[in-house]
Amino acid sequence: MKTNVDTDKFKIYSIDFFEREALSDDLFLVSVKMVNRDDRAFSQTYYLNGLEPTDLDDVSFDAPKYETTAGIDPGTIDPEEIAAQIARAKTMLPEGHTFKSVGNYTIEEAVPSDNDYLNRGKEFGGRTASFVVRFTEDGKETESSAGKTSYIYYEAQVTVGEDGQLSIEAK
């Protein structure tokens, strides 16, 4: 990502890391939202398996301003800190449940929307992090019928507070 985004032209305001498929715990792609000096917002996806990045796509609801967007420097993302957050989240799961994967991990800067209603009460410039944990209930991981098996899992949204504390909420 550091080599793909020209930070002289763009400021990144959102980074999403996604797993390949549910419960795979296999990092597959990174999606980035960024703003250029003309205040146009774009998104682009980078695949970790060697596929070419996607074309730049216009972002429809975001209306960031280049000058007032602080931007997220990919070089400041600390994988060890993220791993520690995930480890702490595992301990917050209900008893009798087992962690399986992180569905996505998001780091974003609050930017204006082009819809005034969505801007109400919003403070711009703050950075947040959140992620989705996927987990199963022990002994009830699958259900089968007619020779087909489905994996049964649950999701919870974990929010990282400014103080580093985690809160978790069922999705």
What are these regions (language model features)?
Residues 3:
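Cationic-aromatic interfacial patches
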Residues 6-45, 109-151:
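Exposed beta-strand-loop-beta-strand "reactive/processing" segments of non-cytosolic proteins
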Residues 22, 41, 63, 70, ...:
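A sequence-composition feature that detects small, non-aromatic residues
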Residues 38-63, 140-171:
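A short, surface-exposed beta-strand/turn
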Residues 53-106:
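Long, charged/polar, surface-exposed segments that mediate recognition or autoinhibition
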Residues 72, 76, 104, 126-127, ...:
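Intrinsically disordered, low-complexity regions
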